[in-house]
Amino acid sequence: YVSLALPIVYMIAIWVMSSLPHNAVIELPNSKIDVFLKESLHLVEFAILYILFVIPLAISGKLTFKTSMIVAIISALYGITDEIHQSFVPYRSATLIDVTKDWIGVIAAWAHVRYHYFHRQKSILNKLTNYYAKITN
């Protein structure tokens, strides 16, 4: 149950961070680098959310192409929810380009899982699944 709670806790963390001004946690001295890094995090942020859904599914043997697609859609839709939320937060904004970056991150992670877990079967997820099967039998 702890592993199933991880994506929910992460979603709450995203929500809380989105409620703060963009420079509330950290602001780098070089504003161009600061903006670049924070904008680049959109690509990673929702990919991590997708992976946090995928790991417990893989370990429990419930990761199928369909469940992978479902959690990818949930992760991508949460990106939209996050942008809508940010539109109501002072000093924050919501943009279509941010949603696009969120979705690109999810799609990249989904494609990686699709190729390595379902086709090659040589991913860390496969190793985790096999390890879990050994210790529970």
Label each PLM-derived region with a short phrase:
Residues 1-54, 131:
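"…centered on the first transmembrane helix and the immediately adjacent amphipathic helix/loop
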Residues 45-60, 104-118:
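Membrane-interfacial alpha-helical segments at the cytosolic side of multi-pass membrane proteins
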